[in-house]
Regions:
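Acidic two-metal-ion nuclease catalytic site recognized across multiple nuclease folds
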Residues: 1-15, 164, 184-206
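Conserved non-catalytic scaffold segment of RNase H-like nuclease domains
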Residues: 3-26, 30-131, 152-174
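Short, structured secondary-structure boundary patches
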Residues: 103-105, 151-153, 188-196
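Short alpha-helix plus adjacent loop in nuclease-associated cores
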Residues: 134-152
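Acidic, divalent-metal-coordinating active-site segment for phosphoryl/phosphodiester hydrolysis
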Residues: 175-186
């Protein structure tokens, strides 16, 4: 009956207004796109509570166990010296477990980030179960198609999605935490856009 308990818990969460729910917005920096052969370089997250981004509760962690940075430093500025001062993936997952328990996980391109996290959890025998999963990329894709607009190439990048809501452009070099913040800002803009009489249920984000 565990599946039924989980289903009911998810249903309850979906009925909440976004401002009533606790969310955790997360981003990863990676060495590549395939969790079977590439690695998590860094993890950044911050909560949204009562409809506000809690920047003071933000966390940023670098994985000291990365074995091959490849071209990663070009994109996020993390080099071997920075990695050496990081933390083990097990430590990072333990921190994430504490931060994410009882919250809705939000990512931009959720299948990518959640896929890498699940691979890391399997490797380190850790289980983290968010209350619900929300993907700002999938939400934006749905909104564009519902409005009858064509889906242009690169229309769903984080930068392109932010631009549609008049949010400022990101710096050319950014990290997991700055991207998590950018995703949190995007989510709140999306919520405002789809709200009716200022109200939006979590179900409308999934």
């Amino acid at each position: 009956m565990k599946w039924l308990t989980n289903y009911y818990s998810q249903w309850q969460t979906k009925q909440l207004l976004v401002e009533q729910a606790e969310l955790l917005v997360l981003d990863l920096e990676l060495t590549g796109l395939d969790p079977r052969q590439h690695e998590i370089v860094s993890v950044g997250w911050l909560p949204i509570k009562a409809g506000r981004i809690a920047v003071s509760k933000a966390q940023y962690h670098i994985n000291k166990e990365v074995t091959a940075l490849a071209q990663s430093p070009v994109y996020h500025g993390i080099d071997a010296d920075t990695v050496a001062q990081g933390e083990t993936m097990a430590t990072i997952l333990a921190e994430l477990h504490r931060a994410l328990t009882g919250k809705v996980l939000v990512c931009h391109n959720l299948p990518m980030d959640w896929g890498f996290l699940k691979a890391a959890m399997r490797k380190h025998h850790v289980t983290i179960r968010p209350k619900l999963l929300v993907d700002t990329l999938a939400l934006e894709k749905r909104r564009i198609l519902q409005q009858g607009y064509p889906l242009a190439q690169d229309a769903l990048t984080l930068s392109a999605c932010r631009a549609r809501y008049g949010l400022p452009a990101q710096r050319s070099q950014h990290n997991a935490l700055s991207d998590a913040l950018a995703t949190a800002e995007l989510l709140l803009a999306q919520v405002q856009a789809i709200s009716i009489n200022g109200k939006c249920k979590v179900a409308e984000l999934t």
